[in-house]
């Protein structure tokens, strides 16, 4: 069974960035121009990030700029990282975090001690020319070797073997997550984007909901999700429940949840195109305000100008040029609730991305996969 979704041709604390200058249901088919503006391969932050390209200056600029939080990944990690490949491509680590701080506590995120884990992880590779992108989802239950990390309080954590992938974030925050991904892939992450549960939910509500079609019922009492087969417009609460459910459909695995997440990301991007946020100033501002409050970025993207420039560079990516796959894994013989990376097949993916090449189909063939493929579509 293929793990690929249906292909389509010390650490510093996050800081609030003040004003600064830039350094360095069935729907009508969206017009091509709108689709180009909408299709960013930035997972949870995608809809919010792209609307920043339309923000103005004055009060709006200062307000949105003041919302942003950033982490200086370069300073935190220093030397010893993979070499940056100057071939026109970009690699972005996108995390959905489940901290229980603030509003997220009501949404069931993180642990009771207030710590956080990366509930969702996607490596986004934007090819040279910014006309195509590949997204590789990393299962949170993957057992990996985590490098030594230093947390935000300056405490050192030794390297660990056979730990869950998502523990890197809870151990040392954003920089430890980046360091772990770079150790796993041998690819330098050019940027980092993180969005929390509360921000994701409000983003969907500000957008007016996201239409999806389910081919069979999805019921999960744990996440209070109950969808009949058919077409639904999901508000933020139900959208969040959908992308988090493990027990509502299929085998209850993280791999099935990833399939649902990937399908929802595509539906979300299509909805951004459909509603035409650029023609509605109030909706544009509301989305931008929500997005800038919800995201944490690397310091290079820590201003509205920088984030808008970054988003603007992705406007040429069409839906037929966005490919989403899952990192090749196999079930752990010692624990069926955990997976192990298929190193040889995964290396084909990492090598392809390092060389700015398409991911070969052989890399995701005959690997472990969930049972939710095709259950949800936009």
Residue ranges of model-derived segments:
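Non-catalytic, solvent-exposed segments at the cell envelope interface
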Residues: 2-378
